[in-house]
């Protein structure tokens, strides 16, 4: 019997965002359904390594660090309640990763990353916002560690933005031109790649990995649990728009339903603790799915809030997320 193809996966399994973890799970599940062995690669960069060989001037280096710091800063300024929620979400995410994601390979430093790259038949990246501006300057997301002869694949990878700054064009073009199969999650991502690389580059637009599993397959993987006896609506708003939350409250009152709020760990608004009948802190991805399954409808500004409402055939109301230091496409 021939050996199964070995596929390295570049995902976001350690993020506290529900969508990031659930699409990591779905991607691994889908790839393995094709008869492949998978390994999720987690890269722990060694700060003493000087291994970025291309386009690594002082300005790109500074911008890359600045972008990274902004991601970390989204959690600064949380009050005591929201900080507690954030820490509980981190713990729940760790439990989910250990329970549902398998074959995780931690690479400490660039040399271990190179060794990992040599052990695969292909390396696949996707989905979420992996292609933020500046990632091509590094070694991991750019797949610079992947040797010739190992296929580079992106599945529905999101850029998270509609345009790149000009300083990113050359490195990003070199990164994308090396892919054997290139796809993104949004039409704007396809347009961005063609703008950077030229109109002749082949880019597909594919569905988010969470859609690769059917409602029944999600049920088989994460069994349904009844979260509340009374009828309710779920409010899952990552942003901090007060009027959106009050809109959900008015709807629930009009329909005579309880309103359940899955508390955001990325923003704070003055009504967070008093607009809902039930505030859920520290919910993990399993709880996220099950609260949606049992709801009459969902109010959300989240891509994956929308996705799991569609998968579970739920009525929903989708808001545009006002920028509050976080992305608007998750």
PLM region descriptions:
Residues 6, 228-233, 257-258:
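Charged active-site motifs of nucleotide-sugar-dependent glycosyltransferases
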Residues 7-18, 22-174:
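Aromatic- and Gly/Pro-rich donor/ligand-binding loops
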Residues 101-122, 131-132, 137-138, 156-231, ...:
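A nucleotide-sugar donor-handling region in carbohydrate enzymes
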Residues 116, 175, 251, 290-291:
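Structural alpha-helical scaffold elements that stabilize or flank donor/cofactor-binding regions
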Residues 125, 184, 299-300:
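Short beta-strand scaffold positions
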Residues 156-160, 237, 244-282:
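Catalytic donor nucleotide-activated moiety binding site of glycosyltransferases and closely related
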Residues 203-211, 215, 264-301:
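Donor nucleotide-activated moiety binding/catalytic core segment of transferases
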Residues 291-330:
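A donor-sugar binding/catalytic signature common to diverse glycosyltransferases
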